[in-house]
Structures are given as C-alpha cells and as structure tokens.
C-alpha cells in the first residue's frame, strides 16, 4: 500500500517538474495548436469587441501582438508602447527608492527626446513621438519627476496623465491600422484555437489531491502546453441527487468572471460521461490549515501573518469589486502556490449581491460565520471581513477565536460564543494585531472594520489596508509596512516557500472514496444544464498559459524560412494547403499499397516481352487517395494521440 502512494507521488512530482521546465508538452503539441487560414477566423470579429480596451488592455495575447505590430510598422507607435511599458514597470517596481528614481529618470529622458536631438536623422526618425501631448503636460510631468528623484520614496502616480493620453492616442489611428493588419488576423487565429472544444483527452491525469463536495480533486496536465492544473470533478448523479445544479453553475460562472492573482482561476470547464469538470489553478503548497496545525503548531510569526492577511485582503477586494460575497473564509480554503503566495479557493458558497441589497441565508462554517449570519439576519460584505478577523486571530494564536481545534462542543454553543463572548488575546498579539482583530471581530456590522465607510463595496478593503498593522513597522515582530503596489504585482517575496519535492496532501489511500450514487437517472433536462457548464477554455487564463509555457513565442511566426508571409496569413494561402481542397497527403499504407500495385503492373508488361500471353492489369480502385489513406489508417488501428 505504501508503494502505491510512493509511485503516485513520484509520478506527480516528475510531472510538476516537467511542466515547470516547459518539457511536459506532448510530442505532437504543434499539431494540436495548428493555426487555420485566417479567413476561417474572420467570423469571430462579430463575437468580440474590436476595440483597444478589449483587445489590447484585456487580452494578454492581444497586447503582445499589438506591440509587435507597432514595433514592425511605425517607430512612433513603437515608442509609445515602450513608454507605456516603462510606466507600468515604474508603478510596480521595488519600493526601495533608488530603483524607482532611476526608472523615473529613464522615463523622463523619453519625454526629453525631441526631434532636434537627432538632426542627422530622417524625417520619420525626427518625429517627436509624443507630439500628441501638450507642452504643459510634459513640463509638469518632467518637473514632478525631477523633484521625485530627490525623494526617499517617489510617488507612483507621476506619469498617470501622460500614460492615459498615450493610451488614448493609440486607441485611434494605431489600433485601426492594427485591426486591418495580419497581426490582428493572427490574434483571431489564437481566438479560434481558444474556442475549440475541450474534453478529457486534452489532459493527462495524476494522483488524487483531495475531496470536494461532489467528487475528487486530482492533478492534471495539459498535453499541448505541459501546464499543470487541479481538476475538480462534480459527479453528475451526486449533483442531481443533492439538487445542486444551481450551486455548481453559480460557482463555475463566478470563477469564470474573476481574474485575480489572489483567487484561484478557472482555466477550462468541460464534461465527461459521468462528471462535470472544473480545471483550476494548481496550488502545490497545500492549505493554511495543514501548515498551521501540522508544520507550525502554535501559530505563525506576525510577519508571515501580515503577508497572508494582505494577499487575502486583496483577493476579497477583487471579489467585492465584482459584487461577489465569498462567505466561507477559513484556513482550509486558503491555498499556497509553489512560491508561497496564497489564493482564495472553493467559491461554492459565493454569491453575487445585486444593487447592493443585503441578503439572507445561514451558510458558512461553524465558528467562522459572522453574528448576523448566526442570527439569520440580512447581511452584506461585512461577513467577509469578520472571516478575515477569525483567520488572522487563528494564524497568530494557533486556534480559532470561538472554538479550539477538535473541541467537542455543540453547534449551538459555538454560535452562542460568536453572538455573546469576547475573544481573548494572549501575549502573542502585538498592539497593532490586537486592535486589527478587535476591529474586524466587532459584533455589530456597522462598527466593524471594513464596514464603516459608505461607498463602493471594494472601499472596505481600503479601510483595512490603512490600518497600522499593515502600514507601520515593528522592530519586535519584524513587521514592516506593506508595499501594496508591489504586492498587487506579485513582486513581494513570500516569507515561506514550499519544498518543491514535497507533496502537501494526504496519502492517496487516506483520502476517502465516494460511495456509488444509486437511484438517480440523468435525462434530457440534465443535458441542457450540462450545455451551460461545458464552455471549454476561459480566455485570459488560457492565453496566459500559452505565453507562460512559451507556446506563443514558438508558434507566433509571421514568415517562413524563405522570408515569405506564412501561408495561413496570405489571402491566396488557402489554396496552398492540401487539406483545404479535399485531398490529404497519402498515408504510409496508402503509399505502400500503391507501390505494390505499380510493381505488379510492371511485371505483367515484362512477361509480354517474353512471348507470354498479355494479362489484363487489375482494375484501379476508384477510391480517392483521401479515402484510401483513411481506410488504410483505420485498418492499421492507429489513433492520433496528442
């Protein structure tokens, strides 16, 4: 039994390593990601927004292709893109002061580069790349940036106005030219690949990592790219038996809407004969509950708690900005990735709040539900901030505020403690940590930290981010102010990094298997529901996957070895591909049988020269080469495996 677990872990770890080294691709991955002729993709223009805001600002591949277009066609457009890239780098750069000052100086030098600086160049080279910016905007920006070079911490919004105006300039003529170019046709080809059907053959499956509410969660790998994911199965009969169709579809739709580095992402959704499948971000580092009670019993240090609390706060801020209420914050729902960053997972209880109207419903986990949920009152985003308070308390103290781990106590008693008892603080809490938890665990929602401001739902996170626990240093605990911009960009080094050779999950045989569901039959109405669920790739995660695994860089070629534009981007290229005119290259057996037929015919002619009576050659098959090739391949029993 132990051998089975060792084998499962070894295969899984090897797959993880190959995926990280870009070696997990199938040998035939290029066949799977083969572009069609661009004319086949033109109908997709009616299905997407052909705007700068959508194609360039929201689509990762669209942004790269637009920058390639600008670099290849117009020096002014290219310099605009360079300016935008440098500003984005500046706004998310290290907050140590000097690096930002140096970067600010390099951006200012771009604004100083007027035509007279290069009198020997051509007219195009001398064109002032930012001529669309007024002298006032440029001078104000340069003055502010020059003064910032002497500040300890330069402001992050120095270039906000020229950045906005540069984007506005690129939205007009440059983007219109891009939309008529082969670079946009290539974007449509990527979108065509993105929209292809997904099924179980798209992935390789590995060991079971855990159990969900309706099925197993296992590791999987995309054959075409080698990227690893977590596959969450929802058994169809189990979902139907519990009348959880709406709940399952709700989780899938919310995951599809959210694109946050602090919330697990949905990359694919498809169905098999027995299950609905969600392909999610793989978090190899385990959950906070495992680390808190198995690796660090007694609690984390405040520096580590601050890091996790900050990333969780950003995750909730992203959810709240989409009007999504999470409602199930607890250590087992916070997962660590390979590098130690955390994400919120399991959005099964999440719900959309419409028109900012409070909702009602007793959902959540005992000991983590806010008092208003326990009292069955109406509630809003404040219940999530209560959950953050419970989580911070547990990470510091090593136990939950209203229930100790494995304590045998009735649900009613835990709910009474939540409603009436005041949590107790030990010497483990600094003053800042204590005031933060007390503010988050206030029994009255109107006085709770994160709920005191009247404004947008995401403004509650700003109130928490301004707390001294996140914005002041503490020499005793080693806590430092959180560089929020840097953290949002994922550039803060986590205080703990999981071991890449470890599997932070139960042994395979220790994970209980689901019993067989009996007495449930699937019918036509279920098929309609599955159609809503089975939507294939999710756009942004899929494009990011293509970029991260270098599939984009390897396939995104515009010219062949002879310097000609690729056939699939040429108007006449559709006639160059044999597959488009109904023929295909003869297979091995087709060529072999044809060769045998020719040899027999030649031998008959040779016999006639010897005086032997002439025989009629065998009748030539009327089948087309494509049919012969297809039948020959079928006879051989070969199947295309990607």
UniProtKB/Swiss-Prot annotation:
One Pfam family in the UniProt entry: Pkinase
GO cellular component: cytoplasm
Entry-linked InterPro entries: AGC-kinase_C, GPCR_kinase, Kinase-like_dom_sf, Prot_kinase_dom, Protein_kinase_ATP_BS, RGS, RGS_sf, RGS_subdomain_2
Superkingdom of source: Eukaryota
RGS domain boundaries: 52-188
Protein name: G protein-coupled receptor kinase 1
Catalytic residues identified in the record: 328
Family that this chain belongs to: Belongs to the protein kinase superfamily. AGC Ser/Thr protein kinase family. GPRK subfamily.
Sequence segments annotated as region (Disordered): 612-642
Keywords: ATP-binding, Kinase, Nucleotide-binding, Phosphoprotein, Serine/threonine-protein kinase, Transferase
Catalytic activity from the UniProt record: [G-protein-coupled receptor] + ATP = [G-protein-coupled receptor]-phosphate + ADP + H(+)
């Amino acid at each position: 039994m132990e051998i089975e677990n060792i084998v499962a872990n070894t295969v899984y770890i090897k797959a993880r390593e190959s995926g990280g080294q870009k070696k997990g691709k199938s040998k035939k991955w290029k066949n799977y990601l083969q572009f069609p002729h661009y004319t086949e993709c033109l109908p997709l223009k009616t299905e997407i927004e052909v705007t700068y805001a959508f194609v360039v600002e929201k689509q990762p591949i669209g942004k790269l292709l637009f920058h390639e277009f600008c670099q290849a066609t117009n020096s002014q457009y290219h310099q605009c893109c360079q300016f935008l890239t440098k500003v984005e780098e500046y706004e998310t750069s290290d907050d140590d002061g000097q690096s930002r000052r140096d970067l600010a100086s390099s951006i200012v030098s771009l604004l100083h580069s007027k035509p007279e600086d290069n009198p020997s160049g051509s007219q195009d080279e001398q064109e002032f790349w930012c001529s669309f910016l007024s002298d006032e905007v440029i001078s104000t920006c340069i003055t502010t940036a020059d003064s910032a070079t002497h500040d300890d911490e330069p402001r992050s919004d120095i270039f906000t106005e020229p950045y906005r105006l540069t984007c506005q300039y690129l939205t007009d003529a440059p983007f219109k030219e891009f939309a008529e170019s082969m670079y946009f046709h290539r974007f449509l080809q990527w979108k065509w690949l993105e929209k292809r059907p997904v099924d179980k053959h798209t992935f390789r499956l590995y060991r079971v990592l855990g159990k969900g509410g309706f099925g197993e969660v296992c590791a999987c790998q995309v054959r075409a790219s080698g990227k690893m994911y977590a596959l969450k199965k929802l058994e169809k009969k189990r979902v139907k038996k519990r009348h959880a169709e709406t709940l399952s579809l709700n989780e899938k739709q919310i995951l599809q809407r959210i694109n946050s580095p602090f919330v697990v992402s949905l990359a694919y959704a498809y169905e098999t004969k027995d299950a609905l499948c969600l392909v999610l971000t793989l978090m190899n580092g385990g959950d906070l509950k495992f680390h808190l009670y198995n690796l660090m019993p007694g609690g984390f240090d405040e520096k580590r708690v601050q890091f996790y609390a900050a990333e969780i706060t950003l995750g909730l801020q992203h959810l709240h900005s989409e009007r999504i209420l999470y409602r199930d914050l607890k250590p087992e729902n916070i997962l660590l990735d390979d590098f130690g960053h955390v994400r919120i997972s399991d959005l099964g209880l999440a719900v959309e709040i419409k028109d900012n109207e409070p909702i009602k419903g007793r959902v959540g986990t005992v000991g983590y539900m806010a008092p208003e949920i326990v009292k069955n009152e109406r509630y809003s985003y404040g219940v999530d901030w209560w959950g953050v308070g419970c989580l911070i308390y547990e990470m510091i103290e090593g136990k939950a505020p209203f229930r100790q781990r494995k304590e045998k106590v009735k649900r009613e008693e835990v709910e009474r403690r939540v409603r009436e008892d005041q949590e107790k603080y030990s010497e483990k809490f600094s003053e800042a940590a204590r005031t933060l938890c007390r503010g988050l665990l206030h029994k009255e929602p109107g006085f709770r930290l994160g709920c005191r401001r009247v404004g947008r739902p995401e403004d509650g996170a700003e109130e928490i981010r301004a707390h001294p626990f996140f914005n002041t240093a503490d020499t005793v605990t080693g806590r430092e102010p959180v560089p929020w911009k840097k953290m949002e960009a994922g550039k803060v080094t986590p205080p703990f990094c999981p071991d890449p050779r470890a599997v932070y999950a139960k042994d395979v045989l220790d994970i209980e298997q689901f019993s067989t569901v009996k007495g449930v039959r699937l019918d036509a109405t279920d098929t309609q529901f599955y159609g809503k669920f089975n939507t294939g790739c999710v756009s942004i995660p899929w494009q990011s996957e293509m970029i991260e695994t270098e599939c984009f860089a390897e396939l995104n070629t515009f010219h062949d070895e002879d310097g000609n534009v690729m056939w699939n981007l040429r108007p006449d290229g559709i006639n160059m591909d044999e597959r488009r005119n109904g023929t295909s290259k003869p297979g091995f057996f087709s060529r072999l049988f044809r060769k045998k037929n020719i040899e027999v015919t030649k031998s008959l002619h040779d016999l006639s020269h010897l005086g032997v009576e002439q025989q009629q050659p065998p009748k030539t098959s009327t089948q087309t080469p494509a049919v012969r090739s297809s039948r020959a391949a079928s006879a051989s029993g070969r199947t295309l495996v990607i």
